[in-house]
């Protein structure tokens, strides 16, 4: 697991993220972007993906074979104790959601997991709870707990390690 605090240095991008009232409108909705090698970033979320994975990645993703790296599955999640949003995110592994849904009823569902995943906290918040818990030693062992913090990026093998968000 890699944790980077104060990840985004571009103040204008941080301000845009903070001020965008629509950023969390589609809570939990599946979204896909093929990456800058297929189309330019058109949304703030796609620009954020570029900032994390293309401009500042510790890996040289633009040189990866496009067959291996086909794009970015992403979604936003907002958790709170109010009734408008869920208060937790249950334990799960990340997977190619579209491929899973397309094959679940075939009798031979295909489970394809990502090489790596990330969690980024784009806005300032004052919450109790909401820890990202990563079960790197298995779901029955003690998890690693990471607090939600503005401008914090967490990178981990999200398809291999079960993870969840604790109650807010």
Which stretches of residues belong to each language-model region?
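Fe(II)/2-oxoglutarate oxygenase catalytic core
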Residues: 1-154, 159-168
């Amino acid at each position: 697991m890699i944790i980077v605090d104060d990840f985004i240095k571009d103040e204008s991008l941080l301000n845009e993220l903070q001020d965008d009232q629509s950023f969390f409108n589609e809570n939990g909705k599946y979204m896909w972007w093929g990456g800058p090698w297929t189309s330019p970033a058109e949304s703030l979320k796609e620009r954020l993906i570029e900032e994390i994975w293309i401009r500042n990645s510790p890996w040289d993703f633009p040189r990866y074979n496009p067959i291996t790296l086909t794009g970015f599955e992403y979604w936003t999640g907002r958790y709170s104790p109010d009734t408008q949003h869920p208060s937790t995110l249950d334990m799960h592994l990340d997977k190619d959601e579209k491929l899973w849904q397309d094959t679940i009823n075939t009798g031979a569902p295909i489970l394809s997991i990502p090489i790596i995943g990330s969690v980024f906290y784009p806005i300032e918040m004052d919450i109790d709870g909401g820890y990202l818990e990563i079960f790197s030693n298995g779901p029955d062992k003690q998890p690693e707990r990471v607090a939600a913090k503005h401008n914090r990026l967490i990178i981990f093998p999200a398809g291999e390690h079960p993870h969840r968000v604790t109650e807010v």
